[in-house]
Amino acid sequence: MSPYPRPRWLVTGASGMLGRELTPLLDRRGAAVTALGRGHLDITDGAAVRSAVAEHRPAVVVNCAAWTAVDEAESEPALAMAVNGEGPRHLAQACRAVGAVLLQLSTDYVFPGSGGRPYREDHPTGPRTVYGCTKRAGERAVLEVLPDTGYIVRTAWLYGAGGPNFVAKMIRLEADEDTVLVVDDQHGQPTWTADLADRLAALGAAALAGTAPAGIYHATNTGGTTWNALAPETFRLLGADPARVRPTTSLALARPAVRPRYSVLDQSRWKAAGLEPLRHWRAALTESFPALCGRAGRPVPGPR
């Protein structure tokens, strides 16, 4: 029997990289899914959000809509706040009106990124960028409006076949460049959208069953690495020489928004809720490769 017999799921931001992964996964598992991309629902429009949620009356809403342009947020703070801060509030208020659960995606950028140990879910936040501040505002809005049915799911370093991302860029650069410079002083967790979508589905089902407490969850592939270690691993899976990836520093590649130096996330809350956390990032990267290579028009390398 399907674990999703009747309840309807509403996915916002369904045309983005994560939404494109989550929507078909829910459909395959027998859920009734309404998928609304940016062209169908602007979450900054409170009236439109209330109307959509009232019309579809979902049991679970997963908000994949977000302003993810980290650097551009520094020069467009009001726009970023409208999407990342006010949008989740509109959704939370609409969910409260119909009794729906809300899964709100968030980010490692809510932390300062200056520590050296994995951040627990209850660790004090301290964003250093406009983007991080707007995402924290969205978290607070959801938890304020939906203390019993609001779920914050923090993730990081997303990649997948449904949109642009670091791994896809490395696949392209391996074909175009002799050597590639990648920063070696940022530590985090690459996260495959397929694995994240699977855990979102499990968390939503557990929320409906009353077995997963509301609050904050960290959802990244486990383990930790640097961009400069992820890039050579990508080259290796392509059958290319990993030594073509050369290290550089964040300072040398300065950008408008500061990047966290260390933003590895602890996932203890999954087991406390009776759910398995995501697997190790290396296993996920290996399994993701056929889809990523297919999107890039590259043949999938055989075993070496």
Swiss-Prot record:
Biological pathway: Carbohydrate biosynthesis; dTDP-L-rhamnose biosynthesis; Antibiotic biosynthesis; streptomycin biosynthesis
Gene Ontology CC: cytosol
InterPro entries (UniProt xref): dTDP_dehydrorham_reduct (IPR005913), NAD(P)-bd_dom_sf (IPR036291), RmlD-like-bd (IPR029903)
Binding positions (NADPH): M17, L18, D42, I43, A66, W67, T68, Y131, K135
EC nos: 1.1.1.133
GO MF, one example: dTDP-4-dehydrorhamnose reductase activity
Site, as annotated: Could provide a fine-tuning to achieve optimal pKa matching between active site and substrate: T107
Cofactor note (record): Binds 1 Mg(2+) ion per monomer.
Subunit structure: Homodimer.
Family indicated by similarity: Belongs to the dTDP-4-dehydrorhamnose reductase family.
The protein's name in its UniProt record: dTDP-4-dehydrorhamnose reductase
Organism of provenance: Streptomyces griseus
